[in-house]
Amino acid sequence: MAAKEVRFHDNARERIVNGVNVLADAVKVTLGPKGRNVLLARSFGAPHITKDGVSVAKEIELKDPFENMGAQMVKEVASKTADVAGDGTTTATVLAQAIVQEGMKYVASGMNPMDLKRGIDKAVHAVIKELQTLSKPVTNSKETAQVAALSANSDEAIGKIIADAMDKVGKEGVITVEDGKSLDNELAVVEGMQFDRGYLSPYFITDPEKQTAVLEDPLVLLYDKKISNIRDLLPVLEQVAKAGKPLLIVAEDVEGEALATLVVNSMRGILKVAAVKAPGFGDRRKAMLEDIAILTGGTVIAEETGLTLEKAGLAELGSAKRVEIGKENTTIIDGAGDKAKIDARVQAIRAQIDAATSDYDREKLQERVAKLSGGVAVIRIGAATEVEMKEKKDRVDDALHATRAAVEEGIVAGGGVALLRARAHIKELKGDNPDQDAGIQIVLRALEAPLRAIAANAGDEPSVIVNKVLEGKGNHGYNAASGQFGDLVEMGVIDPTKVTRTALQNAASIASLILTTDATVAEAGQDSKAKAPAELDY
């Protein structure tokens, strides 16, 4: 086991604070509408330019192990805020730094760190309560666009495209971000249910120009096993041919003789048919087949339910208004399923989302809800270069998360003003002893930090701006983008309540842990004057 170096008291805390400051100062420059970019080197490829606080924080590793501990703890603030709220990472980092810096003064003067922590917790709890009082719900598309634009570094085009996407797929809909092929951002909305499986044979194509197979008013056969023997399929094929309707087959796979027969029948015009593989794998495949069954009003033919392919009839088949099958995707539009059953299925999946422990599972379940209820919107990012596209994508992701947070918990005035207004309401707050009172004072001062950083990045004097904002009331604040004072909500400078709340909670949590640290242990540094390798004789 490697030797360890142990540091105590001020010696330990000082190095931690140095690490906190290095990381926070690098992240802080990105805050506000006039915040700057940070250039991140890559071991291969072009450097990455970003204005996203958590992306900057994740890149930072310090050489000194004690300083690195401080940096990693603040990195945790940014990461946790990004995970929960999706935005506000820079605000959280700035607040954490402010609480640590203020708190260290009191710790150095001999106050009890545990009581300081209790005071900090009391103040944060009171501020969050006040933020919830100040919060108002998002009522229209304009406010949605304003939240998104502000989070995307005041980019109104991004704000508008996100608001449009939300209007089209609803609050529960899935919005994905992809690389575009042009210079402009594009929004594509997939209505109906789309899954990532295409036709099993190009001979099913009905539109050679678009390379798609289109079935109008088809019946839908759902089977959870492979189909390789045409004899199993014949009874149902004959019934479909008599009904004079096209047929979509969704199965684990269709191969060999069965696929060849379907292709021949399709090409001769005897039966308009197309076959695709079922989406997903394992249990997820079964669940998605069941989703398609409910959406189309059909039944999954599976041995568990006592149904076999040979005995299947028209009663087991679902139907839809239209099915479009491409090389890689299948879209079922306007399925004939019972609305009450679809709603019940959506509620059941939502219950699974609440119980899910993994982010991946939660994301996949949310996709299923969207496919059943609203549809999927795809935002394609346009840019001239790959570096610009990555930077834009970062901002769109931030804006998307901020917008969802705003829809969830409402909005407050942005620009650090909500925290200052909440501060005014807790000035009279008292702790159980003078040390707890000092903890409350730490938070009161730290709440100014985001506005100070925004003003400093805009080239203004922070103290002057803070005092002018404090002279006003309600949503009156400083719009750093225009350099004007006024009602920030009317100006469209708004933050999601969830983002502001999460930023403060996480910042206070980590900062108070740093204040209560009295010893640090890290691997002892290696001798910097290590012997140079001996020169070789030639």
UniProtKB/Swiss-Prot annotation:
GO terms for molecular function: ATP binding; ATP-dependent protein folding chaperone; isomerase activity; unfolded protein binding. InterPro entries: Chaperonin_Cpn60_CS (IPR018370), Cpn60/GroEL (IPR001844), Cpn60/GroEL/TCP-1 (IPR002423), GroEL-like_apical_dom_sf (IPR027409), GROEL-like_equatorial_sf (IPR027413), TCP-1-like_intermed_sf (IPR027410). Keywords: ATP-binding, Chaperone, Cytoplasm, Isomerase, Nucleotide-binding. It is found in: Cytoplasm. Its EC number is 5.6.1.7. Coiled coil: none annotated. SUPFAM superfamilies: GroEL apical domain-like, GroEL equatorial domain-like, GroEL-intermediate domain like. It catalyses: ATP + H2O + a folded polypeptide = ADP + phosphate + an unfolded polypeptide. ATP binds at residues 30-33, 51, 87-91, 415, 479-481, 495. Together with its co-chaperonin GroES, plays an essential role in assisting protein folding. The GroEL-GroES system forms a nano-cage that allows encapsulation of the non-native substrate proteins and provides a physical environment optimized to promote and accelerate protein folding. HAMAP family: CH60 (MF_00600). Forms a cylinder of 14 subunits composed of two heptameric rings stacked back-to-back. Interacts with the co-chaperonin GroES. This is Chaperonin GroEL 1. It comes from Chromobacterium violaceum (strain ATCC 12472 / DSM 30191 / JCM 1249 / CCUG 213 / NBRC 12614 / NCIMB 9131 / NCTC 9757 / MK).
